[in-house]
Amino acid sequence: MSKVLVLKTTAQADEVSNSVALTNRFLEEYKKFNPDDEIIIVDLNKDEVGTSILTSETFPTFYQQEVTKKYINLLKSVDKLVIACPMYNFSTPVTLKSFIDHVSVANETFSYKYSKKGDAIGLITNLKAQILGVQGAPLGWYPWGQHTQYVEGAMRFLGIEFNKTVLLAGVKVAPLLELTPAQRVETIIDEVIQAAKTF
């Protein structure tokens, strides 16, 4: 049995959120292959880890906060991580960026201490992660808007390995624009099922 941490990051209400629809459908399929796994869902909008941002005022104590320790320990205690990752203005939601800031702590989640080449060594080596990405534009319209690649890179820096990202792209243009979030997810259901099977 595995423990699975699921991060909800959307600023939208659940009923209109494409990333919530994608995450729910993924978990539905995942449970078919892993019925005994424990699923822990955290809504970053409702937790300090997603709303306490790094600024000049918070920087002096940012990495000493209890919430930082709590989520580093949580990452070390689970086996799998699911990241719901919608695109907002070509980037991730601020809640997800804040989470990444909180858990990226030298000598806790990464280290340069034993590096032979000067690059970082990730210390969160117990985890496999799955990104469930959503974006309004079709893939390739805005090459600089690679929000899922940023998240994957930041998490790999910490030592986390990844299943192939699932991306629901083009939700703000026809033909997907005319569909409900759940219907949009069904257009990539084969990818969702494959990801659930291999995760």
Curated annotation (Swiss-Prot):
- The record's EC number reads 1.6.5.-, 1.7.1.17
Q: Name one Pfam family in it.
A: Flavodoxin_2
Q: Which Gene3D superfamilies match?
A: 3.40.50.360
**Role:** Quinone reductase that provides resistance to thiol-specific stress caused by electrophilic quinones. Also exhibits azoreductase activity. Catalyzes the reductive cleavage of the azo bond in aromatic azo compounds to the corresponding amines.
Please list the reactions this protein catalyses.
Answer: 2 a quinone + NADH + H(+) = 2 a 1,4-benzosemiquinone + NAD(+); N,N-dimethyl-1,4-phenylenediamine + anthranilate + 2 NAD(+) = 2-(4-dimethylaminophenyl)diazenylbenzoate + 2 NADH + 2 H(+)
What domain of life does the native source organism fall in? Bacteria
Its needed co-factors are:
FMN
Keyword tags: Flavoprotein, FMN, NAD, Oxidoreductase
What's its top-level EC category?
oxidoreductase
Q: How does it assemble?
A: Homodimer.
Q: What is the lineage of its organism?
A: Bacteria, Bacillati, Mycoplasmatota, Mollicutes, Mycoplasmataceae
- Single GO MF annotation: electron transfer activity
The note on cofactor binding and number reads:
Binds 1 FMN per subunit.
InterPro entries in the record, alphabetically?
A: Flavodoxin_fold, Flavoprotein-like_sf, FMN-dep_NADH:Q_OxRdtase_AzoR1, NADH:quinone_OxRdtase_FMN_depd
Q: Does the keyword Flavoprotein apply?
A: yes
Q: Which residues bind FMN?
A: S17, N18, S19, M87, Y88, N89, F90
**What family is reported?**
Belongs to the azoreductase type 1 family.
Q: What is this protein called?
A: FMN-dependent NADH:quinone oxidoreductase
